[in-house]
């Protein structure tokens, strides 16, 4: 179910585009350039997608699904260490210019709240209560929609009430590939994440990997480099994204991609149940626009201001266009009936995190906990210069690119979460220690 952000601006004159922006640089992950402000907010679709999934596959009434979130916000929730780590870089430049946003994160003296301190957003509790009582439609055509649209129009935003009212999630046929005795399904175009993940999985199978020695780590880096090169050269500015993604996968399946190889505000939840249903959900607000429309308590996304996903330029998409995405929620089914759900936040580290966890678990036989907690690497692109960022514990002696070492597990490398139901009915779950994830096994 594709519930990703759309380009807004339906019915607006051309002169309304291009404004509402603040260009900032934050120190997160070694330095990130991004754009925030009302003009960076795309049409959010996550709530509509969750509603559709609940209608098709859920057992509980919608109000009961929303109730735990409502109670957490109503009673106040603790600021997590992972959130605080990001906010140390972003609280002023991203969230500090908008008064409701700043007030939610800082005390009366202007101090950023510390990990474990309680966050109170009373207006968000009221919004969740309306959504629980009246359905997801409240966000798109009700009072919440009117509050959001009004704030956008008053502050150079291009998100309109028509954009919200028109938004519909799309059910797409997933990309499916075989890994060992597993069939792995992930999200298809126009998202980039699922296709690049699938290409990496296919390429990793072209060379024997029975451990993470220096040769295998070097091959992993070359696979990431090759897919990154293909993306930069063919996908980010593509006029026919689906055709170019099809070519990527075709060449990866045939091994032809070797010619390419040789040369924080995202969350994920994975769940499986006793009936063998697996659910993988990734939602993103980008880095955050800093915007909290008065009366809503809702932080809005900055998906139009994520530079790596908008290489065509600011506001270059046509209204109604579904934006590209790095997200890759994934499910897999073994021939013995076991099911696995997996995904990760982490911007362009999403796919590289997932592929390494899948290789660790499906191919190398690690437990889910071992697979998620194993050191990772990620090939970065800095203005055309590639660098391999890696966590200590991986032998990088044979890697041909410059390297950037992290001395321990770091939230920069994503926050994978996985849940598995084995054929015998037992459950296995794992949450990434890099981002303070949590797990639970329960039932009704």
Predicted segment positions?
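Active-site rim segments in enzyme catalytic domains, especially the processed small/beta chain
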Residues: 1-2, 7-8, 16-18, 158-160, ...
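Noncatalytic scaffold domains of N-terminal-nucleophile
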Residues: 1-135, 139-141, 145-184, 188, ...
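Short, well-structured alpha-helical segments that form the helix of a local strand-helix-strand
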Residues: 63-74, 146-150, 212-228, 368-378, ...
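Catalytic phosphate/nucleotide-handling subdomain of diverse soluble enzymes
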Residues: 136-222, 227, 292, 299, ...
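Short, small/polar residue-rich loop motifs at catalytic or cofactor-binding pockets
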Residues: 171, 263-266, 325-327
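Internal maturation/activation junctions in enzymes
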Residues: 206-284, 296
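Extended C-terminal subregions enriched in glycine
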Residues: 217, 233, 237-240, 275, ...
């Amino acid at each position: 179910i594709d519930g990703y952000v759309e380009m807004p601006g339906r019915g607006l004159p051309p002169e309304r585009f291009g404004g509402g922006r603040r260009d900032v640089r934050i120190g997160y992950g070694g330095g990130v350039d991004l754009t925030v402000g009302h003009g960076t907010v795309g049409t959010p679709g996550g709530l509509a997608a969750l509603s559709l999934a609940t209608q098709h596959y859920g057992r509980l009434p919608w109000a009961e699904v929303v109730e735990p979130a409502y109670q957490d916000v109503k009673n106040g929730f603790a600021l997590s260490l992972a959130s605080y780590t990001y906010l140390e870089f972003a609280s002023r430049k991203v969230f500090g210019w908008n008064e409701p946003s700043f007030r939610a994160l800082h005390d009366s003296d202007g101090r950023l709240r510390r990990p474990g301190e309680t966050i109170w957003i009373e207006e968000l509790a009221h919004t969740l209560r309306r959504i629980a009582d009246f359905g997801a439609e409240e966000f798109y055509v009700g009072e919440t929609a009117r509050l959001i649209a009004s704030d956008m129009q008053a502050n150079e935003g291009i998100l309109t009430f028509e954009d919200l009212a028109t938004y519909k999630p799309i059910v797409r046929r997933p990309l499916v590939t075989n890994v060992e005795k597993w069939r792995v399904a992930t999200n298809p175009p126009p998202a980039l994440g699922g296709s690049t993940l699938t290409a990496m999985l296919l390429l990793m199978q072209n060379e024997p990997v029975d451990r993470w020695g220096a040769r295998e780590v070097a091959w992993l880096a070359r696979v990431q480099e090759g897919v990154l090169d293909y993306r930069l050269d063919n996908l980010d500015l593509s006029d026919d994204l689906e055709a170019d993604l099809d070519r990527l996968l075709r060449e990866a399946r045939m091994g032809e991609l070797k010619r390419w190889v040789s040369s924080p505000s995202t969350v994920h939840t994975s769940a499986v149940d006793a009936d063998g249903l697996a659910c993988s959900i990734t939602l993103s607000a980008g880095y955050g626009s800093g915007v909290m429309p008065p009366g809503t308590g809702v932080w809005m996304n900055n998906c139009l201001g994520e530079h790596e996903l908008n290489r065509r330029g600011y506001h270059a998409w046509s209204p109604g266009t579904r934006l590209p995405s790095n997200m890759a929620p994934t499910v897999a089914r073994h021939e013995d009936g076991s099911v696995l759900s997996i995904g990760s936040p982490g911007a362009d580290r999403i796919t590289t995190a997932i592929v390494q966890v899948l290789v660790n678990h499906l191919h190398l036989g690690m437990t889910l906990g071992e697979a998620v907690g194993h050191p990772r690497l990620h090939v970065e692109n800095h203005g055309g210069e590639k660098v391999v960022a890696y966590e200590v514990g991986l032998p990088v002696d044979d890697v041909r690119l410059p390297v950037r070492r992290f001395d321990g597990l770091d939230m920069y490398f994503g926050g994978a979460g996985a849940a598995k139901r084995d054929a015998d009915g037992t459950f296995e779950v794992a949450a990434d220690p890099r981002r303070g994830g949590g797990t639970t096994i329960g039932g009704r």
